[in-house]
Amino acid sequence: MRKGPFVGLLGVLAGALVAAPFAFAGGTITGKVTFSGKSEEKEFLFSKFPNPKFCPKNPHKELVKGEKRILPMIEVKDGGLKGAVVAVADIEDKAFIDSYKGTDVVAEFCEFLPYTGVVVKQKNFHVENHDADPEDPKSVKGVLHNPHSFEVLGASSSTVFNIALAEKDSKLDKPVVLRKDKQGSFFRLQCDQHEFMQGYYLPVSNPHFAVAKEDGTFEIKDVPAGKHKLVVFHPGSGKGMRTEVEVDVPEGGKADVKAALK
């Protein structure tokens, strides 16, 4: 049967629709976050905090030095800064925000994990206590942790939630309430029982973010082509103030970024 022009046109349109996702495929941002200084850490005596026999059992041995708990504030390897959060800041993705399930943090051997990450405004922040000490009658059912969260901007800090988790497997699930995120605030977590338990999280509004690896390198895939503003955040650099970097992402290609923090 002879095909008319309308049928042929439908075929062309169908082909165009199938090809569309590939035609508008984004690009990739790769790079390295560098730090001009040296590694820095804080020291805490276990004896000054609850559970001085349990907390030193942390399997991350680099965090335990005899009777002291080490909190790495800045970790530098070959000039690269571990744990920096890099995010595209000029895209608000409603679908991502609506579908975001929340930020998950665990308290494990007196450590909040992950140490750095992201949060989404008004979406939930989950903390689960994994700790119990069968050798301590007071902590058999659970090591008491008290996750206390803050919104921080410069010298300003305000409580978001402050909830005790007394037993193993106890959880909290609270929305991230931010009032100064447009001004550059970040979300801070600290245990009121164990000061060395800390975590820091950057507010984001799209899925285009990454946490720098041990050597400071990162990769963000599927970023819409065009010019974008990146923000780079690390709690130990510049008192947590964000550093901005401009990047031009090529269609289907890569843009390499060098972000230098001080």
What name fits each language-model region?
Residues 24-262:
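Extracytoplasmic copper-binding redox domains, predominantly the cupredoxin/blue-copper superfamily
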